Amino acid sequence: MLQACKMEGFSLTAPPSDDLVTYDSELYQRPMHDYYSFVGSDGESHSDHYWDFSAHHVHNNEFENFPENHFTELQSVQPPQLQQLYRHMELEQMHVLDTPMVPPHTGLSHQVSYMPRMCFPYQTLSPAHQQSSDEEEGERQSPPLEVSDGEADGLEPGPGLLHGETGSKKKIRLYQFLLDLLRSGDMKDSIWWVDKDKGTFQFSSKHKEALAHRWGIQKGNRKKMTYQKMARALRNYGKTGEVKKVKKKLTYQFSGEVLGRGGLAERRLPPH
């Protein structure tokens, strides 16, 4: 028996009734809210909605009337593999959403490792501490290789040449400069003999800076000479033997060799 149907003015003829498969529209219809519940559920409950869909409504005896050529072979994919694939894709999407977006114009500055350092406060000395006694200055360490503080190591003056004479090519040293002042009596308010025969002399506590200033002019220094620098040069002479420190305050002693050379040069000076 043929069943004829009209559709938009065209006549459609159905196949023979022997090959006709009954189709129940209500059997395969599924409400839309089921699909929304599938999308909104978590990953663990997806498999329940997905794999129970066909097993709940479709029965094996309904497909017995279909010939073999009406079926399409599906790929053999196990449900656990599909669940793992879906969870992997879901985790990637969550990772993309959680990643903060950095503006392209934002520049990342280079971070420099911070290393803390300990800083000690600088202690300023009052004028009273700066003008300390010569014994306290003797306790401080002097540069081991320096003979004097910026002092030029010139040659010994030859016979007939006055120490510090203008136009002289020989550079005077500190102990020679002090010996000349003591023997000439110049600046006797700043330096004087304690024992001339032993070569012991002493500086004035009030006028020692004036003597140091004159020594700086004699050397031609650009920086101001102080007694502290001059005393350090005298202590360095204690290592070479020309001058040594005496226990008495601001007191020093020439060596016998320096006194002998000074006496020889004094005897050879031309008479006035």
Curated annotation (Swiss-Prot):
Entry GO terms, CC: chromatin; nucleoplasm; nucleus; transcription regulator complex
Binding site for DNA: K219, R232, R235, K245
Phenotype caused by lack of the gene: Knockout embryos die at a late gestational stage, with no viable embryo after day 18 of gestation. Mutant embryos produce normal numbers of megakaryocytes and erythroid progenitors, but some show an impairment of erythroblast maturation. They exhibit a multilineage defect in the generation of progenitors for B and T lymphocytes, monocytes and granulocytes.
Keyword vocabulary terms for this entry: Activator, Developmental protein, DNA-binding, Nucleus, Phosphoprotein, Proto-oncogene, RNA-binding, Transcription, Transcription regulation
DNA-binding region: 172-255
GO molecular function, one term: sequence-specific DNA binding
One Pfam entry name: Ets
Reported tissue expression: Expressed in spleen, thymus and bone-marrow macrophages.
Activity regulation annotation text: Transcriptional activity at macrophage-specific genes is inhibited by interaction with GFI1, which results in inhibition of SPI1-induced macrophage differentiation of myeloid progenitor cells, but not that of the granulocyte lineage.
Listed PANTHER family: ETS, TRANSCRIPTION FACTOR PU.1
Function: Pioneer transcription factor, which controls hematopoietic cell fate by decompacting stem cell heterochromatin and allowing other transcription factors to enter otherwise inaccessible genomic sites. Once in open chromatin, can directly control gene expression by binding genetic regulatory elements and can also more broadly influence transcription by recruiting transcription factors, such as interferon regulatory factors (IRFs), to otherwise inaccessible genomic regions. Transcriptionally activates genes important for myeloid and lymphoid lineages, such as CSF1R.
Protein name per its UniProtKB record: Transcription factor PU.1
Organism this protein belongs to: Mus musculus
